[in-house]
Amino acid sequence: MDKYAVIGHPIGHSKSPRIHALFAGQTGQDMAYEAVFAPLDGFADTVRRLVAEGYRGFNVTVPFKGEAFKLADALTDRARCAGAVNTLKVQDDGTLLGENTDGAGLVTDLVNNLGVAIAGRDLVVLGAGGAVRGVLAPLLALGPASLHIANRTGARAEQLARDFADLGPVTGGDLDSLMGRQAHVLINGTSAGLDDEVPPLPDDLLHADGGCYDMMYGDRPTAFLRWAAAHGAAWTADGLGMLVEQAAESFALWRGVRPQTGPVIQILRPVQP
């Protein structure tokens, strides 16, 4: 039986073991998948130990995606562009291939599951950290009219925009740069929503048919999605679908078969009162 794991700090909250168990059952794959806690200064040692124990691949979560990028012996184009790795595959010669499936997971959830149009639309993304960097290239590949990155520290958003300027019409700025803008699609890539707080956003930020997507997820609507509902969002979604879709990309890389994600999302989706 092949063994896989998700590595993080913390890791107890992870839904990945259940997701991959459902994928394995659905596709008839003989594999085990577990959550592994790594010390903040012990990611590389943890990976090496697990590889020595015969593990075939890993998902990587906060805060180790940058370290995984450095540890990988080879990188896919998506990982290189994102500057971060959330999936490692142990190749036949024992070397590590680094991949980033976050952006593909977001785009698949938005376009295929939710039916959101991106081409020719105005996008606003909140945040300028690793989570946002990982999704910019796949979003720009869909041909939005504009993509504006807004962050509390405007310089970080501006630098991120410069890094991706060759891929499409992307700009960056601080939260004040949102004044006068209207978004067809507003994406929260910060963790603020988990802390029951939302960055100060203009009341008229959403276009009349604009919707909101939170890359975070929880058993109840995040603070960001509550803001969205209060400000007339035409649709809202949290990041559960993105989580399942990026997991399916990882699973396909490891096992050579792509699972069906819809049934898994339905199983994991909590019933709202």
From Swiss-Prot:
GO terms for cellular component: cytosol. It comes from the Bacteria. The active site is at 65 (proton acceptor). It catalyses: shikimate + NADP(+) = 3-dehydroshikimate + NADPH + H(+). Its EC number is 1.1.1.25. Pathway: Metabolic intermediate biosynthesis; chorismate biosynthesis; chorismate from D-erythrose 4-phosphate and phosphoenolpyruvate: step 4/7. Keywords: Amino-acid biosynthesis, Aromatic amino acid biosynthesis, NADP, Oxidoreductase. Gene3D superfamilies: Leucine Dehydrogenase, chain A, domain 1, NAD(P)-binding Rossmann-like Domain. Shikimate binds at residues 14-16, 61, 86, 102, 217. NADP(+) binds at residues 77, 127-131, 151-156, 215, 239. HAMAP family: Shikimate_DH_AroE. PANTHER family: BIFUNCTIONAL 3-DEHYDROQUINATE DEHYDRATASE_SHIKIMATE DEHYDROGENASE, CHLOROPLASTIC, SHIKIMATE DEHYDROGENASE. Homodimer. Involved in the biosynthesis of the chorismate, which leads to the biosynthesis of aromatic amino acids. Catalyzes the reversible NADPH linked reduction of 3-dehydroshikimate (DHSA) to yield shikimate (SA). This is Shikimate dehydrogenase (NADP(+)). It comes from Thioalkalivibrio sulfidiphilus (strain HL-EbGR7).
